[in-house]
């Protein structure tokens, strides 16, 4: 039996930086609150953790630290998600 967990799209992964962090364009206007959330792909596989938000307020980017053993370049061009319940929790802060 599969459990349905709603996901919230946070943005698309654009590239992998030299230090190994993935850079994703964030769709949320309150992106600073996303730091610390676990990111996933559409299949609910963990990708990594949002470590920082950079760029201008109206066009933010998230720096995602990939989990160990993950080939980050495989996710370039793909959407990144967080669990809806986690997203709602941090947006209420």
PLM features per residue range, with description:
Residues 1-93:
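Peripheral interaction segments used for macromolecular assembly
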